[in-house]
């Protein structure tokens, strides 16, 4: 099930096509933080996106459509903010999400790979952090050329701050742009 906003097309641009897959870039506004929600957004996630939009500059959301149907999204934020190992020359991926009815078809790999290749940020490295028991996301990131960076994180507090920790249960992955 998708939770669509009334009119997202004004802020969404087609940026790449490969076969039957299309990658769209969405520029959020304070009132439309996501164009399409594939899951009912939790309050904390909405607040994090709103704070990112208001206080830290803009983030972008990349939507994957396959044969004209939206199947998932990948949020991209500038680096040097929430994830301490990133710099202002980097980007941070996540969350990325594929709707339940489209899982198991390789779309997560497609959206991450296309986002890394076609996103409009000028970046040197891309980072992602993944809970160490999220094997599907680990496999997706590694298949897209991301490697373990070595840093482990804990996600703490209401706003889910990322804190480096030797015993952290999240693994940081890094992709170096070619």
Annotate each language-model stretch with its function.
Residues 2-3, 147-162:
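Conserved catalytic-core motifs of GNAT/GCN5-like acyltransferases
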Residues 95-98, 104-118, 139-143:
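Conserved acetyl-CoA-binding loop-helix of GNAT-fold acetyltransferases
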